[in-house]
Each structure stands twice: as structure tokens, then as C-alpha cells.
């Protein structure tokens, strides 16, 4: 670990938590944010079509103290479908990278299209929740069954 804004492996979580004076739960959440960002960046479609923005973009890129509880993205171009089920499928394809690279299973648990915030909005907004399980967790081996994958 080199002063990262996120723990970059499961093995880093405990030390990152101590170094940043935070709970293990918060360190787990930060690690999963890192995992999700890696998954999105490793999938050709999401890499081209989703741009990280907001407090976590500042935290990740510039080690800013500003942070939020979610990851905010803007869609670039027409790569990302404006359809709940197609978006879920695309994100689940990207999240499959997590198990190979990070020993974490992850999938979209909830995808919901939000109403446009104002009439001038040009892009739709979605709320997406991701379920995850670490390899050492007791439910890791039946994650797919428990999450209807």
C-alpha cells in the first residue's frame, strides 16, 4: 500500500483501516469501490461508456478528503443502454472480473431508473446496488444461489 485512497487487495484492508483510522467495515466498502472501479475499467463497453465523477472521483484521483457513499458516473456516448435489464446485464458482465482479480464475487442486486431531475436533463439516472462476498466469507461458495445468479 502506498497511501492509496482505497485498499487495493483483501490483504490490505486491515492495515489500510488502521492507517486511515477507520473501521474494518468502512475499509471493506472502500475496497469494494476500488473493485467496482476496476471492473468497470476492465470491461471494454463500460470503460468507454462510463465516466466517474463526484466526490469519489476527486478522492480517487487526487486523494481529496471529500468522499461520498456512492460512486457517480456519467454516460459518455451511446455505449451504455438506457434500459434497466440491459444495464444490469452489462454491469454484471463487468463485475465478473472481480472474482478472477480480487477473489470477490459481485453482482447487481438492484437497478432502478430514476425520474429525470428536471426537464432539461439529457441523460437518465440509475440507482444501482451491488451485492458482494469475499472469498473468506462463509457464503462465498453459494453466492450465486443466494443471489439468484
Regions found by a protein language model. Give the residues of each.
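Compositionally biased terminal segments of proteins
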Residues: 1-149
Amino acid at each position: 500500500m502506498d497511501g492509496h485512497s482505497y485498499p487495493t487487495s483483501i490483504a490490505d484492508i486491515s492495515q489500510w483501516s488502521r492507517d486511515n483510522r477507520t473501521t474494518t467495515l468502512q475499509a471493506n466498502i472502500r475496497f469494494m469501490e476500488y473493485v467496482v472501479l476496476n471492473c468497470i475499467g476492465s470491461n471494454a463497453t463500460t470503460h468507454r461508456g462510463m465516466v466517474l465523477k463526484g466526490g469519489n472521483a476527486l478522492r480517487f484521483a487526487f486523494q481529496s478528503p471529500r468522499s461520498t457513499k456512492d460512486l457517480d458516473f456519467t454516460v459518455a456516448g451511446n455505449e451504455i443502454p438506457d434500459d434497466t435489464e440491459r444495464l444490469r446485464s452489462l454491469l454484471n458482465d463487468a463485475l465478473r472480473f472481480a472474482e478472477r482479480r480480487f477473489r470477490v464475487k459481485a453482482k447487481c442486486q438492484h437497478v432502478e431508473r430514476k425520474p429525470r431531475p428536471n426537464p432539461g436533463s439529457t441523460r437518465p439516472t440509475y440507482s444501482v446496488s451491488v451485492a458482494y462476498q469475499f472469498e473468506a466469507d462463509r457464503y462465498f461458495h453459494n453466492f450465486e444461489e443466494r443471489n439468484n445468479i
